[in-house]
């Protein structure tokens, strides 16, 4: 496929990139578990998530049209940003003169195709001390904007122990001869768009369905330092047996999330 495709009219392809990012920790006591949830809830509140999504919008070359954000009680946050490929012209008479405005289906159609969303899900196990934080991000674009440009930035913006990534292209556009194009760029794997340092840091598994333009990559952090997973304590506070038991439990938790199955 050539680098510069000559298209007939607007590029109607929709590209969607979805992330599930997990941060895992061990908090021994109920007080430590509550403190972890409060800490992660404050660290990734709606205000900070909004800034991260604004950065994503800038990275992929889009423009912010509207922002909706919310912090939830007792914990959790969500942000949705409506984006456009081209910045709205504030001097365009359509935007400054009184009028009925766009039809609802126009606005909703745009929202369905070009938006960035994030939701957070803190969680803890009441008995074994394991706490997890899941963050879901969706970047969906139409036109010439590619959400793949945001891959590395998003992975490094969070404490990403496990990352599940899905990328798909839907719809079709046409070249100047009227021939349908169901994808407008070369891709064999999401890994094609990851930086080398990211590839070195993670164990990765692909499940791709090329004929359907669906690409799936799972990522598990290779480096394991127990101190990075202890909340409210350090390895020096533990006996050898305690440290080994906690490490085994953490590794099991991470593998179960990575493979999406219980390993009992």
UniProtKB/Swiss-Prot annotation:
Binds 1 pyruvoyl group covalently per subunit. Pathway: Amine and polyamine biosynthesis; S-adenosylmethioninamine biosynthesis; S-adenosylmethioninamine from S-adenosyl-L-methionine: step 1/1. SUPFAM superfamilies: S-adenosylmethionine decarboxylase. The record marks 113-114 as: Cleavage (non-hydrolytic). Is synthesized initially as an inactive proenzyme. Formation of the active enzyme involves a self-maturation process in which the active site pyruvoyl group is generated from an internal serine residue via an autocatalytic post-translational modification. Two non-identical subunits are generated from the proenzyme in this reaction, and the pyruvate is formed at the N-terminus of the alpha chain, which is derived from the carboxyl end of the proenzyme. Pfam families: AdoMet_dc (PF02675). One of its GO terms (molecular function) is adenosylmethionine decarboxylase activity. Its cofactor is pyruvate. GO terms for cellular component: cytosol. InterPro entries: AdoMetDC_fam_prok, S-AdoMet_deCO2ase_bac, S-AdoMet_deCO2ase_core. Its EC number is 4.1.1.50. The active site is at residues 114, 119, 142. The keyword Lyase applies. GO terms for biological process: spermidine biosynthetic process. It catalyses: S-adenosyl-L-methionine + H(+) = S-adenosyl 3-(methylsulfanyl)propylamine + CO2. The modification Pyruvic acid (Ser) is found at residue 114. Keywords: Autocatalytic cleavage, Decarboxylase, Lyase, Polyamine biosynthesis, Pyruvate, S-adenosyl-L-methionine, Schiff base, Spermidine biosynthesis, Zymogen. Gene3D superfamilies: S-adenosylmethionine decarboxylase (3.60.90.10). Belongs to the prokaryotic AdoMetDC family. Type 2 subfamily. Heterooctamer of four alpha and four beta chains arranged as a tetramer of alpha/beta heterodimers. Catalyzes the decarboxylation of S-adenosylmethionine to S-adenosylmethioninamine (dcAdoMet), the propylamine donor required for the synthesis of the polyamines spermine and spermidine from the diamine putrescine. This is S-adenosylmethionine decarboxylase proenzyme.
